[in-house]
Every structure is written in structure tokens, then in C-alpha cells.
Amino acid sequence: MSHTEVKLKIPFGNKLLDAVCLVPNKNIAYGIILTHGASGDMNLPHLMSLASHLASHGFFCLRFTCKGLNIVHRIKAYKAVLNYLKTSGEYKLAGVFLGGRSMGSRAAASVMCHTEPDDADDFVRGLICISYPLHHPKQQHKLRDEDLFRIKDPVLFVSGSADEMCEKNLLEKVAQKMQAPSKIHWIEKANHSMAVKGRSTNDVFKEINTQILFWIQEITEMDKK
């Protein structure tokens, strides 16, 4: 399915956030917000690949850049983007999925758990965490799991089985304790950057994109019933 790229400047305090939307050339119902990790920007190859894949299957996709290591700042920026989409007269979406890579997924999780209590119209439908940074390398005793336990809507984790910032058995234990319906897709032998020895980057991207699209479609199809 064809789509159109639209560049945006989203108000954030006295600043503007750079964003790019991929808008399918048909009636759209659902959108996905994506943002990058501690480094890079919205033009991270994997985010671009994922956005293109989702848009080609009929989903509105917005990527935005918010640089910096201050998680509070990142969370506020994410809230501004979510509010922009929710109040936009141009893109009248029935719902959105919040997503991000690494630090971006941590910001998305925080926004989701604070948004849900006031989300009377169920605008936020789910959370997509790519390489969620559950802990610092070699600091497995300090887990970033508090926000995850407060979320009630569906959550998809896509993580590498060799991720130095997300030990496999620890994420599985967290998922079991979450009140939200959760699913974990492990990319075998992938590290935090989703690099896998012996596999091409595009091959890994394809696996990730396929899993995320399938999960989103499962939820949106249930909404139609």
C-alpha cells in the first residue's frame, strides 16, 4: 500500500520537535508513535524500516526526535507528541500505539502508565518496547520495572536474547508479574543494538517488523469485533 511522507514541527514548550509522518493513501484508523534511544534520532535505520513496513500495511506512523539523556525531558516530549495526535483535526485516529527503541521505549512506557487513568476513550491501545533497557549493564539488581507494573493495556517486548541491558530471565519474570497482557519476542543472539553475528541487518529488521505488525493487527482486529 502506498503512503505519503509528511514532515512536521510539533510544539513542545517554547520549542518545536522534528517529526515525520507516513500517511497511508487510504482511510486510516490507527497510528503508531516511534522514537529513538539515548543516541541517534528519528532517522535511525530500524525506525525508518519499521515505520515504512507499518505504513505499507495501512497504519499511520509518526517518528520524532528528542535528543538528550534526561528521561523526564524525553517523557514530556513524548506526551506533547501524543497530545498533538489526539487533538489533531487532520489525522482523526481511533487509537494509537506508543512505541520506541531503548530509552525511547522507557519514555513511552512512562507516558502510557500515566495516561491510562484519564484515557476514557481508550485512545492509547498498546505499547511496543524494542530493546527495553530493563537495567544498566551488570546492574541487574536495579530494574526499571515500576512503570511496567502499572500498565494495563497490551504490551509487546521485542528484545535480543543476548541484550546486555535486558537479561532474558529477568524480563520474563517482570512480564509474568505485569497486570497488562504482555508478549515477548526474542531475537536469538541479538545484543542491545539488535546486531546478530552471521545475520544481515535487514534480515533482523524483517523479523522485528513482521512480529510488530502481526501483534498490532491482532489487537486492531479484536477492536472490530
From Swiss-Prot:
Superkingdom in the source lineage: Eukaryota
Name of protein: Testis-expressed protein 30
Organism for this UniProt entry: Mus musculus (Mouse)
